Amino acid sequence: MKKVLIVLLLFVTTAVFADVSIDFDYKSMSGFASNQIALWVENDNGEIVKTIFVTDFTASHRGYKKREQSLNHWVGIAKPDKMTDSEIDAISSATPKSGTQHFKWDLTDSHGKKVPAGKYFIKLEGTLYAGSNVVDAGTVDTGNATPGPIEVALERSEPATTKNEIMLQNVQMSVK
């Protein structure tokens, strides 16, 4: 009986929630060096745990070498120069069509292993136009999280009146 109870308690404490949902409205913009998006997870040490999505131009086409301002936060932490083509191919995709975008983080790292309990930062970066970037970030403690919304903070490289400022809007993150 004790073994069953211990196993049950272990299951309940490790399965507090299944994933984190990340939803946002994306509007395709015109202009030089725009429409670049990256979504990734960092641990409490500021190390990348997993890239969930990054646009092809920046990743697969190594666009960050042509335009240093393209997703410079993601490039700085993900270090795509050290990634193989197959690693980049696994996380990159075409720039999405305008509309609401839905992504999930399944609490795994880039190798598909469940992450240990702890604090993680989910970050969504958008290159709006040339050197103008935004980063939306939410924090989740996988060892102490309850289902519901995650507060999202926005960091801008320029004022809100910058060109293409409406590219990423209504960013929502939640524990499911």
Short names for language-model regions:
Residues 1-5, 39:
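Bacterial N-terminal signal peptides that target proteins for export
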Residues 18-61, 132-176:
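Primarily secretory-pathway and cell-envelope proteins
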Residues 44-116:
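Structured domain cores in non-transmembrane regions
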Residues 125-129:
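Beta-strand-rich extracellular modules
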Residues 112, 131-132:
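Short, cysteine-centered beta-strand-loop-beta hairpins and adjacent loop/turn segments enriched
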Residues 33, 97-99, 118, 167:
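Residue-level preference for beta-strand/loop junctions
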Residues 4-14:
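Sec-dependent N-terminal signal peptides
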